[in-house]
Amino acid sequence: MPKPSRGPRMCSGPDHERLVLANMSASLFLNKKLRTTEARAKRLRPFAEKLVTLSKRGGLHSRRRALSILRNKAALHELFTNIAPLVEDRNGGYTRITKVGFRSGDGAPMALIELILEPVSARTRGTDTLPDTVTDTGPDSAPDPVPGSEPGSAAGDLPDADTAPADPGESSSNQRVIR
């Protein structure tokens, strides 16, 4: 007997769950946001994002497949004519889920799921980590000395491992212990 792979059903059965997800995604496409429970928002996200990806392909076949899932011509028109061109440059991640508190009646955690219609920011990788000026870091350039590492300074007073006393019973405050 087949079992649900994504945990327990949101509603009474698989057919009813598909209808609820279709109605919720139609409301999401028409209103651009939807306030629902956290569990329903998490189940709606992949369902709606697959429909947005389908609408980005365009074409009659994609439109008919989306209509067979959505069953709402107004939402289908909104999805294909208004939403798809806005998310054309975005590769996934078309929705955002924001937790908004708890429902007053039964204390269920509520969430706001909304479409991300802003254009993708044109960031270049690594520009925020590079310094403004680049210095010569070739093999001939020596690294800057670390402060306190000069001979005679406090950090340079430790004896080398070769010059440490050979007798283990002899203790010194500057003795380096090798383990």
UniProtKB/Swiss-Prot annotation:
InterPro entries: Ribosomal_bL17, Ribosomal_bL17_CS, Ribosomal_bL17_sf
CC per GO annotation: cytosolic large ribosomal subunit
Pfam families: Ribosomal_L17
Transmembrane domains' residue ranges: none
Record field: compositional bias (Low complexity): 154-168
Keywords, alphabetical: Ribonucleoprotein, Ribosomal protein
Family, per entry: Belongs to the bacterial ribosomal protein bL17 family.
Record HAMAP family: Ribosomal_bL17
Protein name per the record: Large ribosomal subunit protein bL17
Organism: Tropheryma whipplei (strain Twist) (Whipple's bacillus)
